[in-house]
Amino acid sequence: MSKEKFARTKPHCNVGTIGHVDHGKTSLTAAITKVLAEAGGATFQAYDQIDKAPEERARGITISTAHVEYETEARHYAHVDCPGHADYVKNMITGAAQMDGAILVVSAADGPMPQTREHILLARQVGVPALVVFLNKCDMVDDEELLELVELEVRELLTSYDFPGDDIPIVKGSALAALEDSDPKLGHDAILELMKAVDDYIPQPERPKDKPFLMPIEDVFSISGRGTVVTGRVERGIVKVGEEIEIIGIRDTQKTTCTGVEMFRKLLDQGEAGDNIGALLRGTKRDDVERGQVLAKPGSITPHTKFKCEAYILTKEEGGRHTPFFSNYRPQFYFRTTDVTGTIELPEGTEMVMPGDNIGMTVQLIAPIAMDEGLRFAIREGGRTVGAGVVASIVQ
């Protein structure tokens, strides 16, 4: 009998596996689908099905990502797994595959390695809200004390990057044992324990519709006798006719009232996350608004010109720069719908940035942009993308 499609009645959550190369991220992904398939919550996907991940493009960057889906009693999950380290870096920075939480895979035989650190740092910088740890390959370690040492080391590492290292669930097991049905305790049972930890510890993300209203302005029209209409896709929240909203970014913040919402030439009483709408603004002149500003719920987001970010710089092969850049490099930063020029300040001790690097840096824009932590952007030179970034913290 063929399985029916997943019912979308359960709350949905996006997760992904992160960690050092060869610590078992893809094997774990396969093992989760295998164990959950027994309960009817997934379709088993073997290692090689997941490993040959298709390429996709996000913000002008090609990334290989494998997507699998499965469900537990509690939730429906979309799970991303990347074949190579560079794909992880690109994925996390561009937000191509949103992660509401991540499963950090650490080999018990090796302990934390350089990419373990780097992925934890990236998770912190791009705002992954919660991590759960799977200590893999425990069947290769006979010494209980060694396992405890590795666990301690992982907890200390997490704490050093501002994650709650003492509280994060760490599940010991073996993805291979689950795939080969060799040791039920380290295999099957450990996977179920891990999924229970993911269910309980990774918070349910707030739906875009429940967040405060925000719409990036794409176009501005003036309609005789009616006033000024701005169009765009509502990014989050709901706007109701008659509500006061703010126009933020590029210029001084203005207050206005939304006197009409139009979609597909029909008048509506509200627009919500995902809708492409035209919003009629009371008393706003055509020249008072421009592409690149946002409409937002008053007080929910503020304009800023200086921020710290994490960025990935494209290689020459990816269509990026052929040469490194230095402090005071001035490209354009493309936020939502517009480019703003900004100056880059590299961290102390970093002389230059090579194509293919990922780097934390500070940016000073020439005009303010409505931003909060986690906002994604592209770095461009004369219209071509040379990098991608995410706001890690706001300076001013």
Swiss-Prot record:
This chain's source organism reads Rhodospirillum rubrum (strain ATCC 11170 / ATH 1.1.1 / DSM 467 / LMG 4362 / NCIMB 8255 / S1)
Q: Where is this region: G5?
A: 174-176
The family database entries (Pfam families) matched by this protein are listed as: GTP_EFTU, GTP_EFTU_D2, GTP_EFTU_D3
Q: Where is this region: G3?
A: 81-84
Species classification? Bacteria, Pseudomonadati, Pseudomonadota, Alphaproteobacteria, Rhodospirillales
Q: Where is this region: G4?
A: 136-139
- Report what the protein is called: Elongation factor Tu 1
Similarity section: Belongs to the TRAFAC class translation factor GTPase superfamily. Classic translation factor GTPase family. EF-Tu/EF-1A subfamily.
Q: Which residues bind Mg(2+)?
A: 26
Q: Does the keyword Ligase apply?
A: no
Chain ranges of the tr-type G domain: 10-206
EC main group: hydrolase
Q: What is its EC number?
A: 3.6.5.3
Q: Where in the cell is it found?
A: Cytoplasm
What's its catalytic activity?
GTP + H2O = GDP + phosphate + H(+)
Fetch the InterPro entries from UniProt: EF-Tu_GTP-bd (IPR041709), EF-Tu_GTPase (IPR050055), EFTu-like_2 (IPR004161), EFTU_2 (IPR033720), G_TR_CS (IPR031157), P-loop_NTPase (IPR027417), Small_GTP-bd (IPR005225), T_Tr_GTP-bd_dom (IPR000795)
Binding partners and assembly: Monomer.
- One Gene Ontology MF term: GTP binding
Swiss-Prot/TrEMBL keywords: Cytoplasm, Elongation factor, GTP-binding, Hydrolase, Magnesium, Metal-binding, Nucleotide-binding, Protein biosynthesis
Instruction: Output a single Gene Ontology CC term carried by this record.
Output: cytosol
Q: Which residues bind GTP?
A: 19-26, 81-85, 136-139
| Primary role | GTP hydrolase that promotes the GTP-dependent binding of aminoacyl-tRNA to the A-site of ribosomes during protein biosynthesis.
HAMAP family xrefs: EF_Tu_B
Record's keyword annotation contains GTP-binding: yes
